[in-house]
Amino acid sequence: MSNIPAELKYVDSHEWLRLEADGSVTVGITAHAQELLGDIVFVELPKVGASLAKDEQAGVVESVKAASDVYCPIAGEVLAVNEELEGEPELANSDPYGDGWFFKIKPANAADLNGLMDAAAYAKEIGA
């Protein structure tokens, strides 16, 4: 079974979100997503300063098995991207909830986080 941290929020496209103390939101792909993808060999991230709509494509993950789009789970402005992933895309496999994060976003509306799945709902979604 996949590791599903209780403190995070989730969406059905297999991204996780963590609300930070400064009000920003860190986004990455779930352990379940990286297990399905297999060994990740390339990650394309959004540009810092980009304004993304909810469910807009924010990047791409390529693995030995497939390429998959990464979506922005809430609307907002990209504040930072994880540049470590450019040289070490395998961090998304080895530490999906830590060093393998994808980008940070300033939410257009913090209330958007309220409609997202908690860990229990995500576990049910993926049959864990």
From Swiss-Prot:
- Source domain of life is Bacteria
Gene Ontology cellular component terms for the protein in this record = cytosol; glycine cleavage complex
Kindly give the PANTHER family that the UniProt entry links to this protein: GLYCINE CLEAVAGE SYSTEM H PROTEIN (PTHR11715), GLYCINE CLEAVAGE SYSTEM H PROTEIN-RELATED (PTHR11715:SF3)
The protein, known as: Glycine cleavage system H protein
Which purpose does this protein serve, as stated in its record?
The glycine cleavage system catalyzes the degradation of glycine. The H protein shuttles the methylamine group of glycine from the P protein to the T protein.
The record places domain Lipoyl-binding at 24-106
Q: Recite the UniProt cofactor note for this protein.
A: Binds 1 lipoyl cofactor covalently.
- This chain is encoded by the gene named gcvH
Q: Family membership, please give it.
A: Belongs to the GcvH family.
Question: Which controlled-vocabulary keywords does the entry list?
Answer: Lipoyl
What quaternary structure, including any partners, is listed in this protein's UniProt entry?
The glycine cleavage system is composed of four proteins: P, T, L and H.
Q: Per the UniProt entry, what species is this protein from, by scientific name? A: Chromobacterium violaceum (strain ATCC 12472 / DSM 30191 / JCM 1249 / CCUG 213 / NBRC 12614 / NCIMB 9131 / NCTC 9757 / MK)
Q: Which GO terms describe its biological process?
A: glycine decarboxylation via glycine cleavage system
Please give the cofactor(s) recorded in the UniProt entry for this protein: (R)-lipoate
Spell out the Gene3D superfamilies in the cross-references.
Answer: 2.40.50.100
Q: N6-lipoyllysine occurs at which residues? A: K65
